[in-house]
Design a protein with these regions (language model features):
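Active-site-adjacent structural elements that line small-molecule/cofactor binding pockets in enzymes
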Residues: 1-138
Length: 138
């Protein structure tokens, strides 16, 4: 039996039409929550995930501490650009998102599901549909 198998992954995503920082803001928020969870709750197996991403416990500990003190929005403020980049979100402007999806495709991913976060998710859905999908389908 010969079957095609899709290799899929769910990726943190957020987009803005023109402002890269605003487009990365939602991804920064969910990355903060995920990273805090890795530090606080998933010892052991999380170390492997962090190693693969090139993240150090000391690097993300401030994210977890901020989550404990002030919740997800406080944690978001501790997610630096360097940390966010290591998390490999599909985030930023439409052009940034196209480039990020191409990276996933080049790595062998054949099915990408987006976990949208941030402001105005309906607008984000529209932007992905109109300004990203036409360039990455195929």
């Amino acid at each position: 039996m010969n079957a095609d198998i899709d290799l899929g992954c769910t990726v943190v995503a957020s987009i803005h039409a023109t402002d890269r920082d605003r487009g990365r803001d939602g991804a920064r928020e969910i990355a903060g929550m995920y990273l805090a969870n890795k530090v606080q709750n998933i010892q052991g197996s999380a170390d492997t995930l962090l190693d693969l991403a090139g993240l150090e416990q000391d690097e993300i500990r401030p994210v977890a501490e901020a989550m404990e003190r002030g919740g997800r929005l406080a944690a978001k403020e501790q997610v630096t650009d360097a940390i966010l980049d290591k998390c490999k979100p599909i985030a930023g402007t439409p052009e940034d998102c196209i480039a990020a999806i191409e990276e996933y495709k080049d790595a062998g991913c054949t099915h990408v599901m987006l976990e949208l976060w941030g402001a105005d998710r309906q607008e984000q859905i529209r932007l992905f549909g109109e300004r990203v999908l036409p360039y990455v389908r195929g």
